[in-house]
């Protein structure tokens, strides 16, 4: 059903709006989820006219449109207001424009606000939306906020208090675009629609879980931002722990947003908080140095533009989380995330316990691999007999990958997540209880790294991280399942 809504984007002149938001809204328009009864108000400091704003929108969607006319018709629903977030008069003008557009498009007073700006402005915007009666209780009112949601628990808590002054928790959608990816959402199907997995998804059968977020790129033009953030804040506090919660949660009573969210929150509340000694042993940080991949030379992190030449910011983080629940108590959830690694890829490996062998040789563990990006799908490794006269065992794989055609047809994560907001589905968004629990744990690791002399390990560009990350798994009698660097070295592609 087509949504009736006035969308207001704060930060409408920014890169995110042009690259992600306008194309995602256009796809929803093409699919009929937005049609006649919607309008978009773009606000930013730049003094744009409506006509110029429309041209920016058209340019951002032209390659998706069936015709220029279709793109222009979509863009005609867009309106622009030059806006200073600190100026009360601008909110009065915004309220008047919203009222006019609500009447023109018969939007039934439904309002969606998207804060595509730096978090320090969130509180100011929320306060003015409430004080100037733009948030007035008529129709639905929903707020989407981008990451990062704070830089630690203290700043995140203050940010949350500011938003709660104008919106209720159920109206706030903290977006994490990874949760919009097709295979992330398919984890529910893999787990809860297949008896062979759900019955063994526990500590009696699973030895360890491995989560890898690997990037081949370095920090590129984001050196200034990244040097103040690092891998732990940038990737672990949100993406990694959100994915962990989907893997570790108990089966919800029903497939509804409230039941799913309740089970996810239990995981966050059950995250084990290690002792200081355990933190030192179980969490690794690293920073890339120069290297050569496929004949291309790459500089070290400290040589990147806008990076402190003596920076101790980590570009790689690895460790072991534990969930103190009946289902997974004692099972390590290993993670690693880093820049300038061998290959881009997000993989989850569920490593099952080894069986006692009657064949006179140890058996390879069964491993369920979930491929999230760049390919999507899953595989299951099994032990089977090799063809031939002798009875020799070898692992083989049941493999399903979504082909390029199907992958291209799947919704963009932002499209899927905006669709969910319009339909009041908060399943794939972070509740404050999840955010607060994750920051409390991440803050402990950050504090240790900042004040206790924990080593910052070097790793060569093109590797899969420092040796310490591999040594960590060995302490648990495990090893990383995905090691693309081995093949690269054998092929002479790494130096």
Regions flagged by a language model, labelled:
Residues 1-145, 149-495:
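Secretory/organelle targeting and membrane-embedding segments
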């Amino acid at each position: 059903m087509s949504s009736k809504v006035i969308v207001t984007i704060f930060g409408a002149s920014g890169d995110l709006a042009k690259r992600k938001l306008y194309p995602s809204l256009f796809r929803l328009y093409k699919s009929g989820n937005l049609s006649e009864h919607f309008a978009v108000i773009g606000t930013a400091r730049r003094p744009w006219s409506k006509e110029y704003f429309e041209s920016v929108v058209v340019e951002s969607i032209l390659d998706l449109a069936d015709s220029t006319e279709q793109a222009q018709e979509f863009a005609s629903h867009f309106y622009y207001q030059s806006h200073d977030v600190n100026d009360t008069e601008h909110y009065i003008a915004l309220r008047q424009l919203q009222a006019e557009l609500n009447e023109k498009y018969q939007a039934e007073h439904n309002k969606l606000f998207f804060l595509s700006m730096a978090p320090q402005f969130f509180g100011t915007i929320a306060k003015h939306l409430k004080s100037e009666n733009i948030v007035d209780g008529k129709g639905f009112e929903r707020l989407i906020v981008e990451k990062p949601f704070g830089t630690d628990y203290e700043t995140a808590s203050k940010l949350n208090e500011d938003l709660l002054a104008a919106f209720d928790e159920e109206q706030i959608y903290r977006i994490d675009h990874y949760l919009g990816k097709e295979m992330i959402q398919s984890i529910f199907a893999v787990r809860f629609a297949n008896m062979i997995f759900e019955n063994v998804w526990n500590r009696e059968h699973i030895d360890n879980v491995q989560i890898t977020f690997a990037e081949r790129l370095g920090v590129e033009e984001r050196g200034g931002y990244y040097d103040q953030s690092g891998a732990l804040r940038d990737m672990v506090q949100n993406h990694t722990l959100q994915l962990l919660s989907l893997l570790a949660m108990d089966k919800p009573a029903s497939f509804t947003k409230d039941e799913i969210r309740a089970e996810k929150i239990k995981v966050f509340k059950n995250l084990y908080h290690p002792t200081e000694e355990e933190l030192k042993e179980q969490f690794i940080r690293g920073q890339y140095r120069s290297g050569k991949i496929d004949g291309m030379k790459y500089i070290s992190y400290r040589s990147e533009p806008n990076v402190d030449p003596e920076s101790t910011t980590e570009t790689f983080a690895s460790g072991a989380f534990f969930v103190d629940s009946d289902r997974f108590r004692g099972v390590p959830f290993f993670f690693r995330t880093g820049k300038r690694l061998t290959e881009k890829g997000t993989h989850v490996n569920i490593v099952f316990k080894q069986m006692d062998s009657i064949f006179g040789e140890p058996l390879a563990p069964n491993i369920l691999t979930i491929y999230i990006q760049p390919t999507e799908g899953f595989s299951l490794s099994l032990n089977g007999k090799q063809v031939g006269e002798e009875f020799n065992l070898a692992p083989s794989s049941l493999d399903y990958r979504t082909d390029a055609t199907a992958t291209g047809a799947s919704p963009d994560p932002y499209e899927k997540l905006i669709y969910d907001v319009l339909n009041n589905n908060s399943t794939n968004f972070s509740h404050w209880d999840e955010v607060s629990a994750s920051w409390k744990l991440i803050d402990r690791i950050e504090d240790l790294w900042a004040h206790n002399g924990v080593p910052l390990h070097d790793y060569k560009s093109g590797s899969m991280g420092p040796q310490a990350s591999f040594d960590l798994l060995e302490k648990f009698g495990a090893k990383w399942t995905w090691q693309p660097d081995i093949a690269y070295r054998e092929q002479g592609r790494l130096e």
